[in-house]
Amino acid sequence: MLKRIFIYTLISFTSSISFAQNIDSITVVKTKWERTRIAKQVKLYRHHFNQKNLFAANENISFLEIKNTGRRAIFALGAEEKELITTSNFGIRDTAIAALNGNFFDVKNGGSVDFVRVNGKVINTNRLDKNGERARHQQAAVVIDNGKIMVKKWDGSTDWETKLSEQNIMLNGPLLTYNTNDELLDTTSFTRLRHPRTCLGIKPNGKILLLTVDGRNENSAGMSLHELTKLMKWLGCRTSINFDGGGSTTLWVNGMPNGGVVNYPTDNKKWDHEGQRKVSNVILVKKK
């Protein structure tokens, strides 16, 4: 009898999870996003799920969709070896259409803790974990060649990133999905708990999504990496990679209100557009 009750409970629990996921996926797919044309081949999408109707929470999501042709809109990296700069100031300095915060960095001393190469020059190298192993955010790379952006997966070798042919490289992660296959995520609080998130996704048609999910506020809970993985798949991405998030999460678009800051950065602990954290590097979208 107890065995039957256990099996019934397990089936019911599994069914409820599947039902919730199905509801969430339908919610995302059927959402009427606020859409703004930013430039040729660049569109901005925004929506505030404010009825606790995505993952049973409020979620504020913003993303750019960019044609990855290397023609009218091109990708580039902005980076500093030591100095920390806000995402918006990186964008303004480099006369960009848009900017998205990049990889993980030393908040106290400045400089990325992950390998970065810009126009052939190495800006920062990897700081390995205490056990000498690569961090999860050093096991994939965003690379740019002739203005086109791609994601590459670490091959397991020690100096993998130094042998990549692209002149512009930013290690980042963890990788969430690669060519439609979900990557195995760890069980740390960074993965399991909800935080503001920054993410890059690639759709089957080659279009790129640069996405932010706001968090640490009653207006937007943030997401776990498992939730972020699902969101990117529901938005049609076959590959997606997590960037530095938390207080760093910022999407800036030239010409938009609030100084171009589209999302709600959290470093000031207020629900406004003023809470940018200074960062080490960014992904840039520029006119060719």
Task: For each feature predicted by the language model, list its residue ranges.
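Bacterial Sec-dependent N-terminal signal peptides
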Residues: 1-25
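Active-site-adjacent helix-turn-beta-strand microarchitecture at beta-sheet edges
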Residues: 105-190
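Zymogen propeptides
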Residues: 21-134, 140-141
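Conserved, well-ordered active-site substructure
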Residues: 110-128, 186-202, 207-237, 248-288
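Structural recognition of the beta-strand scaffold that forms the well-ordered cores
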Residues: 65, 97-101, 141-143, 150-152, ...
